[in-house]
């Protein structure tokens, strides 16, 4: 058995070994490497009866989010529902109204993905939906069935011995909350289609400003890879750092942001809840000793680092609130930090360890072609952090991750 202090290092060595294989995997596409053995598929662990995943209540931010109100055929929100005519899914449709086929696009996407998994897992068996959108009031108050955000499912052969594994397949398909609710079915639900919580990860608003090396202040939406922006070095001093890539860039997406406001000096920074921010519990802590924590964990009375004259200085958090804004940008600098709206932040999100994240991105600093390859998207989440996030889920403890996970990573 390895000593406790060594285990994280061993995990990280596995990280680095796998990262070395990334250029070939991305450059050559799918295919078997000569002389390699096929790895057996990852063993899926069925959910136990009455188990739910994630292990939080359904209508919380870390799962499917709050109830937003019943949708009737006559309501304005009815247009949010779309029919699902997938021939690989059997809809029970007891009401003979087609209601069970109606659902949000997010729910439809997850359900279609699950249908493929079911056929692959059990040849000749299809996914069966016993309940989708409910307009008749047959469920409990504030049920997500009333919004088309929930489905109850079985397999077409109604073999109850399959339902635990069916629930696990639903988790893998990307449903935001899965509950092995009954011996007769599995309950699955998703976040609201227009809720900013349906997309998370680590970003700043499009209009958030950074300082370039020439002294100019520009919005993140105008920053380009190769620009040098104000950041913080390992020793806690201000420095200018190269922008390598955008980990996420979505100019037309509504996002929920955590707003951190300070006093003396007054600053206001908006960033997504899963993003890392440097904090301390008192103002005497040296800048290099400020610790990284998720923005959603920051409390009034704690201290963040802000740019001042000279250098960086602590500022007391006066208020924390939430705000929804259009557009989100997440640049990665060579130092792994940046100063946004005069507040020092990490470039990383979703995982609680800033230093581990910085180490995991070393290939992008050593091999620029990884950042600039033809597979780099102009919008959306860059493939590299998505790959790291999925890999980290296999190697690191669950407590290492923010419950909201990462945008576009299937979490």
Curated annotation (Swiss-Prot):
Q: Hey, where's the site called Essential for auto-cleavage on this chain?
A: 275
Glycosylation sites (chain numbering)? 282
Note the SUPFAM superfamilies from the entry. Hedgehog/DD-peptidase (SSF55166), Hedgehog/intein (Hint) domain (SSF51294)
- UniProt source species: Mus musculus (Mouse)
The protein's gene is named Ihh
The reply on keyword Cytoplasm is no
Per the similarity annotation, which family is this? Belongs to the hedgehog family.
EC code(s) of this entry? 3.1.-.-
Protein name per its UniProtKB record: Indian hedgehog protein
Positions annotated to bind Zn(2+) = 145, 152, 187
Lineage, uppermost ranks: Eukaryota, Metazoa, Chordata, Craniata, Vertebrata
- Record lipid sites (N-palmitoyl cysteine): 28
- Could you say what a knockout of this gene produces? Almost half of homozygous embryos mice for IHH died between 10.5 and 12.5 dpc. Also some lethality occurred in late gestation, most of the remaining embryos developed to term but died at birth, due to respiratory failure. Mutants display markedly reduced chondrocyte proliferation, maturation of chondrocytes at inappropriate position, and a failure of osteoblast development in endochondral bones.
């Amino acid at each position: 058995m390895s000593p406790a202090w060594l285990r994280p290092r061993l995990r990280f060595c596995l990280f680095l070994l796998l990262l070395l294989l990334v250029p070939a995997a991305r450059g050559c596409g799918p295919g078997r490497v000569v002389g390699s053995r096929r790895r057996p598929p990852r063993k899926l662990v069925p959910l136990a009866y009455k188990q739910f995943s994630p292990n939080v209540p359904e209508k919380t931010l870390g799962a499917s989010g709050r109830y937003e109100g019943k949708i009737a055929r006559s309501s304005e929100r009815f247009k949010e529902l779309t029919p699902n005519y997938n021939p690989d899914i059997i809809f029970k449709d007891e009401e003979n109204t087609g209601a069970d086929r109606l659902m949000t696009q997010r729910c439809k996407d997850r359900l279609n993905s699950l249908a493929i998994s079911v056929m692959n897992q059990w040849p000749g068996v299809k996914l069966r939906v016993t309940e989708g959108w409910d307009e008749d009031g047959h469920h409990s108050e504030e049920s997500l069935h009333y919004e088309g955000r929930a489905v109850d499912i079985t397999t077409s052969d109604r073999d109850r011995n399959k339902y635990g594994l069916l629930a696990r397949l639903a988790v893998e398909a990307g449903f935001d909350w899965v509950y092995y609710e009954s011996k007769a079915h599995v309950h699955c639900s998703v976040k609201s289609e227009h809720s900013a919580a349906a997309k998370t990860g680590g970003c700043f608003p499009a209009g958030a400003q950074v300082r370039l090396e020439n002294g100019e202040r520009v919005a993140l939406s105008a920053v380009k890879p190769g620009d040098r922006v104000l950041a913080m070095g390992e020793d806690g001093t201000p420095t200018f750092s190269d922008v390598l890539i955008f980990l996420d860039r979505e100019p037309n997406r509504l996002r929920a942001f955590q707003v951190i406001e300070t006093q003396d000096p007054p600053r206001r920074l908006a960033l997504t809840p899963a993003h890392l921010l440097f904090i301390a519990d008192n103002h005497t802590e040296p800048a290099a000793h400020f610790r990284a924590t998720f923005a959603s964990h920051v409390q009034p009375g704690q201290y963040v680092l802000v740019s001042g004259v000279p250098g960086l200085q602590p500022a007391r958090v006066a208020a924390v609130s939430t705000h929804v804004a259009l557009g989100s940008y997440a640049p990665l600098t060579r130092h792994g930090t940046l100063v946004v709206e005069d507040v020092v932040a990490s470039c990383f999100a979703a995982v609680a360890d800033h230093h581990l994240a910085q180490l995991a991105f070393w290939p992008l600093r050593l091999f620029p072609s990884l950042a600039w390859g033809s597979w780099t998207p102009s919008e959306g989440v860059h493939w590299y952090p998505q790959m790291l996030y999925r890999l980290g889920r296999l190697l690191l403890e669950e407590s290492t991750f923010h419950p909201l996970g990462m945008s576009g990573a299937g979490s």
